[in-house]
Amino acid sequence: MSLPDATVVKAFLLDLQHRICAGLEQLDGQASFAADSWTRAEGGGGTSRVLTQGAVFEQAGVNFSHVTGAAMPASATAHRPELAGRSFEAMGVSLVIHPKNPYIPTTHANVRFFIAHKDGAEPVWWFGGGFDLTPYYPFEEDVREWHQSAKNLCQPFGDDVYPKYKKWCDEYFFLPHRNETRGVGGLFFDDLNQAGFDKSFDFMQAVGNGFLTAYAPIVERRKDTDYGERERDFQLYRRGRYVEFNLVYDRGTLFGLQTGGRTESILMSMPPLVRWQYAYTPAAGSPEADLYDNYLKPRDWV
């Protein structure tokens, strides 16, 4: 089995962050990303790049981090208790994009690499990541295209890869207290190492490189759609689900907070504006009801 090489992974992640930011700036056409580099007392650091108040994107954050620690946190060992007490090295790129126009979906993507060390033992390493889409006023063609892009990038790695990671995404981005998915899904994978380092790294790269290929056409198609106060209010209400999921369930958020990570970078996934409304129910037959009735439950899209 090929040995893990954190150096090449880090180089890819830094380049990926740069390319995604450049692509988003081109889509926005007005605003640019501000870079904010930081260091972590316990070891490591990163660069957060944030775009605010653009023509298309209300806020977009693309974060690179590379951190080390003396002991794996509870969030990382809950499903792998044999790793408790190991030192660790974690690196990744994580992004969340909150568009202005309610007809453009919010999206999230992440690719990451972990190594857990223990004296006298082989290092335990794995890749994880994925991307998912959260529309407010969904269009079926957009969702199908999104999933087709996900399926296309998975295809070279086997016929079973897309269905497996699509299902995992539906299960992971689910809010039990709301009994609904966070959005229309995409891909989610974790603990990837069975095929060896090179092939596992190839797949992680395919996911990272495939994100903008999947998202950019949807932005281009919807960015000039007219909207009013009603659509904006619903967008802000639905953004509340994003906050609920990230603060209550998301393993990445919990990992960052439990390892003493940089709070500003961890919480840059939060939308800049959001609202809650008591006992909201969309009117039957409305565009808002269409989201609940047809999109917030797992479906086969391709």
Swiss-Prot record:
Its main location: cytoplasm. The record marks H177 as: Important for dimerization. One of its GO terms (biological process) is protoporphyrinogen IX biosynthetic process. A divalent metal cation binds at H98, H108, H147, H177. Pathway: Porphyrin-containing compound metabolism; protoporphyrin-IX biosynthesis; protoporphyrinogen-IX from coproporphyrinogen-III (O2 route): step 1/1. The keyword Cytoplasm applies. Its EC number is 1.3.3.3. It catalyses: coproporphyrinogen III + O2 + 2 H(+) = protoporphyrinogen IX + 2 CO2 + 2 H2O. Keywords: Cytoplasm, Heme biosynthesis, Metal-binding, Oxidoreductase, Porphyrin biosynthesis. Gene3D superfamilies: Coproporphyrinogen III oxidase, aerobic. Substrate binds at S94, N110, V111, R112, G260, G261, R262. It is found in: Cytoplasm. Its cofactor is a divalent metal cation. Homodimer. This is Oxygen-dependent coproporphyrinogen-III oxidase.
